[in-house]
A protein has these predicted regions:
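Alpha-helical structural signal in soluble globular domains
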Residues: 51, 108, 152-160, 215-219, ...
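Metallocofactor- and cofactor-centric catalytic cores in central/energy metabolism, strongly enriched
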Residues: 1-133, 147, 157-160, 168, ...
Length: 382
């Protein structure tokens, strides 16, 4: 299939791997963060880390929308279903994220909450049309990729006068999170997390373009290469980052030119700006409170804001102490560093959010990488 098969071509990937081995300087270590969970999944699925030279290391970032959702936000959705009698609609992965009191949306549903999995906000709108006597809340999460559909859903609800529909808006923003990582003590002070550059997200960049990454690439001297999700995309992006580091450059480059432009999708951006605005701050799992890193519904559209309609008050809840999800989201640790990975915490029984979604670092490592952690002993045959 055009635009897919050629980006999964093993011969091309091997040629790029050869170039990386030739161009990665022997006396230097390279450390690049793939921000997006889709890239984390691709790196694990296609064994990309094994194709890289030993001195080129990939670090998982917080780009999985389900993973960065804090417990307190899940608690609000559960509260709406169990205490307020609302129909809560959300995406499938969100249903299994652990919340307080050993609950999740799935377990709250088992307790009698009317919680439904949907594929889009349009599905939630249809439920609101069919059940006008019930309050219907769309629990909207995700990065800039899923934000325009949420804004469109709110606009359609207003046009149709659906007074029983509202949105619990938990959309988050990529550039603010990357800046927060670069300002973190692990990167700036202690050197615990050496970062030489970023593999920029694909779908997010289709919406926002490459321009929003330019300020911190210049300010922090960290190159960014936007890449598609196929293995050749990722390999080429890593090669481009190595070349930038070797040449002392720190600019934004676009490997994913078949889908991403500098300005992004202006129509989608205008729709989001019409309905949503930036929050002063928002808690991310693993990162804590991140300034200007999320969106809320504008005052003009407050009739469709579930937080305002139900008088919800957010309460921060600490993560399970045994779970290393926060450190993994910051790039400080890897899934194998967590003591409960693969024992207490599995995809069937996730303790942390990183094990829930296929884009989570722990779930990806469970599916494609956990057997690499097992030491292999070669025994001489008699």
């Amino acid at each position: 299939m055009k635009y897919i098969d050629e980006f999964r071509d093993g011969a091309i990937a091997r040629k790029i791997a050869d170039r990386l081995r030739a161009e990665a300087l022997p006396g230097r270590d390279y450390s690049f963060m793939e921000f997006c969970g889709g890239h984390t999944h691709a790196i694990s699925r296609y064994g990309i880390a094994e194709l890289l030279p030993p001195n080129v290391r990939m670090v998982h970032g917080p780009g999985c929308p389900v993973c960065v959702l804090p417990i307190g936000r899940i608690d609000l959705a559960i509260q709406l279903a169990l205490e307020r009698g609302a129909i809560v609609c959300t995406y499938g992965d969100t249903m299994r994220v652990p919340a307080s009191d050993n609950l999740s949306l799935v377990r709250a549903k088992a307790r009698g909450g009317d919680i439904r999995m949907v594929y889009s906000g349009a599905d939630a709108l249809e439920i609101a049309r069919r059940e006008p006597q019930r309050e219907v809340v769309f629990f909207a999460i995700g990065f800039e990729t899923t934000t325009p559909p949420t804004a469109l859903t709110i606009r359609r609800a207003k046009e149709e006068g659906l007074a029983n529909f509202s949105v619990l808006c938990c959309h988050v923003l990529t550039p603010a999170a990357i800046t927060h990582i670069l300002e973190s003590p692990e990167v700036r002070d202690s050197g615990t997390l050496p970062l030489d550059g970023f593999v920029g997200p694909a779908h997010v960049s289709i919406v926002i373009g490459s321009a929003p990454y330019e300020p911190f690439a210049a300010a922090y001297r960290k190159p960014v290469v936007i890449a598609g999700f196929e293995p050749v995309d990722v390999m080429q992006a890593v090669l481009m980052l190595v070349r930038q580091v070797n040449e002392g450059r720190s600019v934004v480059e676009n490997e994913f030119t078949r889908a991403v432009g500098r300005q992004g999708n202006r129509h989608a951006q205008a729709l989001v700006a019409e309905v949503l605005e930036t929050r002063p701050g928002f808690e991310w799992r693993g990162l804590g409170e991140v300034p200007a890193s999320a969106l809320r519904i504008r005052q003009e559209w407050a009739a469709f804001d579930a937080e305002a309609r139900f008088g919800l008050e957010y309460r921060a809840v600490p993560d399970n102490k045994a779970c290393e999800c926060g450190a993994i989201l910051r790039g400080v640790k890897k899934p194998a560093d967590c003591k409960i990975f693969g024992t207490v915490c599995t995809p069937e029984n996730p303790v942390g959010s990183c094990m829930v979604s296929s884009e989570g670092a722990c779930a990806a490592h469970w599916s494609y990488g956990r057997f690499r952690d097992i030491p292999v002993r070669a025994e001489a045959l008699a």
